[in-house]
């Protein structure tokens, strides 16, 4: 086993875990780490490399499941709802939020993969996503109607789902677009973040599962240690990142992440253009 290649797998998993759920664009970071430094997945071959990227994303998804496990058990009816008759987030809220991007993603998947995954489009997505986040913070309602995820209405869920369609453009960031959208339609930053992460699990798991089925046959036994290392690294760092982000979001809001995204866009611009 090549320990340097194993370290590359761990580093890529770390980058995926730290950035997948933060509103900073995991795609933008993977461009820098993968293309400019590691050339990380060359040792796996093209098709196994695609599978590796899916596997480390599954590590991030598992971290979100762990953080929100009680909520998912409740949504699926495995655990009973809290008494008191207060409004609660339902599975229907999640489905409504997923529909717009889910439908567009299925219809335009091939076009997006073939025409939108480039350094230039990611650069554009980083900047436009940052501007959306700045606008969201600027016009955020001081007294948000939905202070917690359980106070989100079906209308708000649908509107957030519409804004999530922007994340189909690489670099825009799923969490960045949906949290900004949630804030703009009257959610607190924490409520929007909770709803974003809960919605992300089924849509990411579905997309990753399909991709895994398409590419798994290209993986060899020798690749397995790298997949395990990347998966575990992504899981651990995503777990830390999600908990840290949720703890901070109501206090620091979105502008610091927007500034970071613009700085990242400048770095990519000067490195590539």
UniProtKB/Swiss-Prot annotation:
It catalyses: di-trans,octa-cis-undecaprenyl diphosphate + H2O = di-trans,octa-cis-undecaprenyl phosphate + phosphate + H(+). GO terms for cellular component: plasma membrane. One of its GO terms (molecular function) is undecaprenyl-diphosphatase activity. It comes from Geobacillus thermodenitrificans (strain NG80-2). Its main location: membrane. Its EC number is 3.6.1.27. This is Undecaprenyl-diphosphatase. The gene is uppP. It is a multi-pass membrane protein. Catalyzes the dephosphorylation of undecaprenyl diphosphate (UPP). Confers resistance to bacitracin. Belongs to the UppP family. It is found in: Cell membrane. Keywords: Antibiotic resistance, Cell membrane, Cell shape, Cell wall biogenesis/degradation, Hydrolase, Membrane, Peptidoglycan synthesis, Transmembrane, Transmembrane helix.
